[in-house]
């Protein structure tokens, strides 16, 4: 089971966006990276195609999972993740507050 999943609210721990929060758009476990909305924005020079115009577009670039931490559901600060079995299901738990992350 992954600690960071699509739809999670995360906090950036290091890099140019340190301290900023965003939502995970996509997780790439093989590369140990994730796309986070509004984080690690890069400019891409787009060539003209039949459907798109030429120009410079901004888009999110992947960020390594080690630079992300789940935002605690209670106070929004970065927390580590633990696992617990409740009602026969494995759920994620915030180590900081003990709050469940999976509904």
From Swiss-Prot:
Q: List the Pfam families.
A: KOW, ribosomal_L24
What does the entry give for GO biological process?
Answer: translation
Listed A to Z, the keywords are:
Ribonucleoprotein, Ribosomal protein, RNA-binding, rRNA-binding
| One of the record's GO molecular function terms | structural constituent of ribosome
A GO-annotated cellular component: ribosome
Is the keyword Zinc in the record?
no
**Keyword RNA-binding carried by entry:** yes
Question: What family is it from?
Answer: Belongs to the universal ribosomal protein uL24 family.
Its annotated function is as follows: One of two assembly initiator proteins, it binds directly to the 5'-end of the 23S rRNA, where it nucleates assembly of the 50S subunit.
Cite the record's note on assembly. Part of the 50S ribosomal subunit.
Q: Which NCBIfam families match?
A: rplX_bact (TIGR01079)
According to UniProt, the name of this protein is Large ribosomal subunit protein uL24
Q: What organism is the protein native to?
A: Brucella ovis (strain ATCC 25840 / 63/290 / NCTC 10512)
Q: Which gene encodes it?
A: rplX
